[in-house]
């Protein structure tokens, strides 16, 4: 339990940020899962479209502080190379 008003406020803010960041992470994971599913089905057009949709979401996560930029770059790079390798 927070002992000062300042600590209580920080605790409230942390809960609020946690909920917002959790929703953002979930949304980004959904976009990435759509790319994975398209790759698994072998549909290059669908995979490319899903990748194009996922990139701005991933970068938005970086700008909002949900992911480190290197993490997002690594994910994009790996997915891009897998989409490129499709027939």
From Swiss-Prot:
Positions of the UniProt region annotated as Disordered: 1-22, 65-87
Disulfide bond annotation, renumbered to this chain: none
One example GO MF annotation: small ribosomal subunit rRNA binding
InterPro entries: Ribosomal_bS20, Ribosomal_bS20_sf
Entry's Gene Ontology BP terms: translation
Gene3D superfamilies to which the protein is assigned, alphabetical: Ribosomal protein S20 (1.20.58.110)
Keyword Nucleotide-binding: no
GO CC terms: small ribosomal subunit
Swiss-Prot/TrEMBL keywords: Ribonucleoprotein, Ribosomal protein, RNA-binding, rRNA-binding
HAMAP family the record matches: Ribosomal_bS20
Function: Binds directly to 16S ribosomal RNA.
Matches recorded under PANTHER family: 30S RIBOSOMAL PROTEIN S20, SMALL RIBOSOMAL SUBUNIT PROTEIN BS20C
Family: Belongs to the bacterial ribosomal protein bS20 family.
The protein's name in its UniProt record: Small ribosomal subunit protein bS20
Naturally occurring in which organism (per UniProt): Ruegeria pomeroyi (strain ATCC 700808 / DSM 15171 / DSS-3)
């Amino acid at each position: 339990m927070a002992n000062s008003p300042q600590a209580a406020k920080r605790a409230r803010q942390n809960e609020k940020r946690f909920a917002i960041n959790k929703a953002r992470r979930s949304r980004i994971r959904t976009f990435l899962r759509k790319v994975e599913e398209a790759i698994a089905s072998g549909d290059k057009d669908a995979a490319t479209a899903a990748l194009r949709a996922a990139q701005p979401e991933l970068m938005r996560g970086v700008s909002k502080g949900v992911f480190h930029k290197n993490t997002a770059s690594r994910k994009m790079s790996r997915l891009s190379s897998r989409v490129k390798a499709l027939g």
